Curated annotation (Swiss-Prot):
PROSITE patterns: UBIA (PS00943). Converts heme B (protoheme IX) to heme O by substitution of the vinyl group on carbon 2 of heme B porphyrin ring with a hydroxyethyl farnesyl side group. GO terms for biological process: heme O biosynthetic process. The gene is cyoE. Belongs to the UbiA prenyltransferase family. Protoheme IX farnesyltransferase subfamily. Its main location: membrane. Residues 1-9, 57-78, 127-197, 248-268 are cytoplasmic. Its EC number is 2.5.1.141. Pathway: Porphyrin-containing compound metabolism; heme O biosynthesis; heme O from protoheme: step 1/1. GO terms for cellular component: plasma membrane. Gene3D superfamilies: UbiA prenyltransferase. This is Protoheme IX farnesyltransferase.
Amino acid sequence: MMFKQYLQVTKPGIIFGNLISVIGGFLLASKGSIDYPLFIYTLVGVSLVVASGCVFNNYIDRDIDRKMERTKNRVLVKGLISPGVSLVYATLLGIAGFMLLWFGANPLACWLGVMGFVVYVGVYSLYMKRHSVYGTLIGSLSGAAPPVIGYCAVTGDFDSGAAILLAIFSLWQMPHSYAIAIFRFKDYQAANIPVLPVIKGISVAKNHITLYIIAFAVATLMLTLGGYAGYKYLVVAAAVSVWWLGMALRGYKVEDDKVWARKLFGFSIIAITALSIMMSVDFMVPNSQNLLTYVW
């Protein structure tokens, strides 16, 4: 029973979703030549770091989680794990994850993990989520870290491919998160969380969703245009982007915003999963200069 509670507080669904993107970034960089020990170290390391961040987030958010319907039954809210124990647990998970990335992958992968962790826990969870409408934007940067870590674990470089991955996954996070905020509007309102739909209105959020999907579509194409992914990837990327954009545009005419937002959210998962799979299997050897080469 206790195992289940310690697992739940790490948010397994979030860990699984991040692992899909880590695999995408790792295999994109591997170009068919997979270092399996490195692959395992990277996956487990990122999983532990994400788990640590989620436990810290649960600790920080336990007051507002009580006010939200979807989070009122979380482990810390119900007192099934004490706050003090959760902090120790989160710290141990983080230390283990960072050590695996440092020694099992490379220092760059570890530092990227540290930066993503600090942004998520220190900047987003502790401050931006509660005080700024731009919290979602800041949070999107940490959400985009896992595929970049997977990529850089192989290359040891933060090159243009890594930058494109950062752009793709950051831009994807925005409509994905705004969709959640729309169909969970009352929850965010009750907890006084200043997400865009609550502060500026759902109609403004729809405009932002549309613009971010357009930007996302452009970013996805850059993997092929930059020589990192092939044309099969390009076709899938274009198809999911056009479909997702079409869903966003239909949102201007719907009668039930919550139903529409839930569908948009659901397709966002399909879209990013499809892209992660395609970049894993349809890769090209790039011919581009590094933006930043990490020398160790």
